[in-house]
Amino acid sequence: MRFFKAVILTAAALCGQFLYGQSNNLTLDQATQVALQHNLSVVQADASIGSAQAAVTAAYGGYLPFLSASGSWNRYSTDKAFSTTTNLGGGTFIIPPSKSTINQFGSGLSANLTLFDGFNRQGQVGQATSRSVSAEQTAVRTRQSIVFQTESAYLNILRNNELVKVADENLKRDNKQLERITESARVGASARADVYRQQSIVAADEFALIQAQATYDKSKADLVDLIGLDVGAEYTFNDPSISLEISAGQLDSTASMYGSFKDLEQRSLAARPDYKSAVETYNAAVSGVTSAKSTYFPAVNASAGYSLGTADALSNLSDTKTINWGLRISWTLFDGFATNANVQSAVANRRIAEIGVVQAERDVYAQLKKALLDFEAARKQYEVSQKGVTSATEDRKIAEEKYNLGAGTLLDLLTANAALVQAQVNLVNSVYNYITAKKNVEYSIGERAY
């Protein structure tokens, strides 16, 4: 409860800041908190919990008596317009015209209680309870999924921002090189063809920068849409807690922190809400078989009633009192195989749900295995990309010095520069791949609660 209050207050504070323009920067934690409050998938999942819990209450209501109260008033008016003659005891009597009005009042209270219905109530309660738990687990997994999607989208923004910086630095570097080559060609120290070649490289750099900027802007729009904010508004995304530098100690510690795969399998099965939801779906199907078989048994109901009535004034309502009670036993001996069809359908649903549990278990193992493989690959890629940037930086420096001294060609310099840009891109990608892969492992285990 404290957590949800904190989330609501944080979201309200953020919305207030956006509304009054005090701040439009979102950190990763703020983005996830806003997503948990405004993402429509989360809202829908939470709404389904309320519906499922109401069904549980209704199922338990089957154990309670049904009570009803009634009241009535009827007015009867009789008008005999003509006299009538009747013979009675040997004599003849004339009944003159007459008018009469009778008011009839009544009230009653009745109760009906199911004593036994072939275990149908037990099945209904079991189904409703399991479905309620399944809805809760689905909502938990939905929150985990939205948080992971938000984290991935946020990290993708930071990645694209770094790639924009790489493209911008490369453009500036090539522009400076173009100035040197142009000046060198003006004094006759370089060929005019080198100028044209460098100009084409600068144009390609400008194109790459425009493309990188567009990708960055679109990734921001994707995140804003995901967390449920106004896509038309402008936001910045910066989180000082996310560093591009990953030490060797961090790499080694994270590589060994998860333990063996068997241990992770057990942790995942114990924690994954989607697996728990599949198990509860199976439990609901088992209860469904119980309910379907209930028609094979007799049903026993008890009833009682109390009523008041009068054919006079309402003040005399208690003149006639009636009390009734009794038991009713009913047993369907043959219903055209309808019960058998219902049972077979329920058994089939139970089997389908059982297969769903097995499939959910396989999915947990497969997702966990792939997440660990991606994490290990990202760790190795980061180590390699660091070496690549160091080597490419030195190679480009040497190629530039050779070209300036006339000992190297422009092609050698362009090749070295392209290798440096690619190495920088690889480093940026490897950093964010590593962070994302680590969060994916946590998401695959499913232990984090929100």
Model-found features: residue ranges?
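Periplasmic alpha-helical coiled-coil/stalk elements that build and connect Gram-negative outer-membrane
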Residues: 145-264, 374, 378
